[in-house]
Regions:
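Flavin-dependent oxidoreductase catalytic cores
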Residues: 1-377, 389-391
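Intrinsically disordered, low-complexity polybasic segments
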Residues: 376-384
């Protein structure tokens, strides 16, 4: 495994990663009631940035007061939210790692109870609910769409102020951008619907506005072409998502982040043999992040055998939840902690969030590094004292 491309550097958003195992965006609902990042979140991300050179993508950051709809999800539209995130990015950078902020407008997928409590109106590309039991959203006007594009750009600027190395646009899983991209949710008859080109318009405008605001090489895009989560999945997503990816390439985005068809949200899913991401991987010439059901025993095959000529990075979600030292464990072929699905979304609860143990081997290595660092510091101090005496 040590010779695998998994351990080769990769440049994303202008920073050089030391390996190709990353942590994707994972909603955990541990922010405050007013959507501000908490000290508990700082500890969580700090734990998972203990192996230098690792890339972390945060849980989705809500771009504006009306863009949310999940309880205790963090936002990035207020100055105090920016300041709270800065404590987290500083911690991650102190550990020698890198961190990207995912940006989201939840759209029609907002939790109805949370939306009502916070005065959020459920909106989407069209007045189509994501399932029969869900509320019917209101179709956005073109003026409102323009404002949302602006909100994404402002949130991206806030993310850079907060110390993030870049941003990732959430264009997957049935949230607002995805609801415009696919014809199962978009039946508009204006410039934002009715054709492949028009359905790509919102994501294109967001990519362009965010790229203009912070530079396209600080921007990535997450897509889930085959996912059925939250009422999605076109009959044939290939032409539509090929168009989106082509536009992302034209705008010189840093990377694309693709969700495998074998997962739906945090669950494994059945999929047909022809449902692959190959069309997207073939189109894109830059770094590609792949997420969905990867295990330590199959990642080497993906990088070294399946896509040997592509700059692939593999993202581990559930495994990173339960293993703060995941990269170390994979590199040293150590067993993984089991994750507890029941604690994934327990609001403001430290259980199942910051209490997963590091491996004994990692803690021993960390202790040795601390001892070595202390000896080096002591030796340097002695040398400086000797120089002062000679003078």
């Amino acid at each position: 495994m040590a010779r695998s491309r998994l351990w080769r550097p990769l440049k994303i958003c202008g920073v050089e990663l030391k390996h190709r195992i990353g942590m994707p965006s994972l909603s955990r609902l541990r922010a405050s009631d007013d959507h501000t990042a908490t000290p508990m979140m700082k500890e969580y991300y700090g734990q998972r940035s203990q192996v230098a050179g690792t890339l972390i993508i945060t849980e989705a950051g809500i771009i504006s007061p009306g863009a949310g709809g999940f309880p205790n999800a963090p936002g990035i539209w207020r100055d105090d939210q920016v300041a709270a995130w800065k404590t987290i990015t500083d911690e991650v950078h102190r550990n020698g790692c890198f961190i990207i902020c995912q940006l989201i407008h939840v759209g029609r997928a907002a939790n109805p109870e949370t939306a009502e409590a916070e005065g959020i109106e459920l909106v989407s590309s069209s007045a189509i609910p994501y399932d029969e039991a869900a509320p019917v959203p209101r179709a956005l006007t073109t003026d409102e769409i323009e404002r949302i594009v602006h909100d994404f750009a402002t949130a991206a600027e806030n993310a850079i102020r907060a110390g993030f190395d870049g941003v990732e646009l959430h264009g997957a899983n049935g949230y607002l951008i995805d609801s415009f991209t696919q014809d199962v949710s978009n039946i508009r008859a204006d410039e934002y619907g009715g054709s492949v080109e028009n359905r790509s318009r919102l994501v294109y405008e967001v990519m362009r506005a965010v790229g203009d605001a912070i530079g396209p090489q600080r921007v990535g895009l997450r897509l889930s072409p085959w996912s059925t989560f939250q009422g999605m999945r076109m009959r044939d997503p290939v032409p539509q998502f090929s168009d989106v990816i082509t536009k992302a390439k034209e705008l010189s985005l840093s990377y694309i982040h693709l969700v495998e068809p074998r997962v739906t949200n945090n669950e494994d899913a059945e999929h047909a043999v022809h449902e692959t991401l190959d069309f997207a991987i073939d189109l894109w010439t830059g770094p590609i992040l792949l997420a969905g059901g990867y295990r330590p025993d199959n990642v080497q095959r993906v990088l070294d055998d399946a896509y040997p000529n592509k700059d692939i990075m593999v993202m581990f979600g559930r495994a990173f939840v339960a293993n703060p030292d995941l990269v170390f464990r994979i590199k040293n072929s150590l067993p993984l902690n089991a994750y507890h699905r029941s604690t994934f979304y327990t609001v403001k609860n430290p259980a199942g969030y910051i209490d997963y143990p590091f491996s004994e081997q990692f803690l021993h290595r960390l202790q040795n590094l601390v001892v070595a660092g202390s000896k080096k510091k002591k030796k340097k101090k002695e040398e400086e004292e000797e120089e002062e005496e000679e003078q």
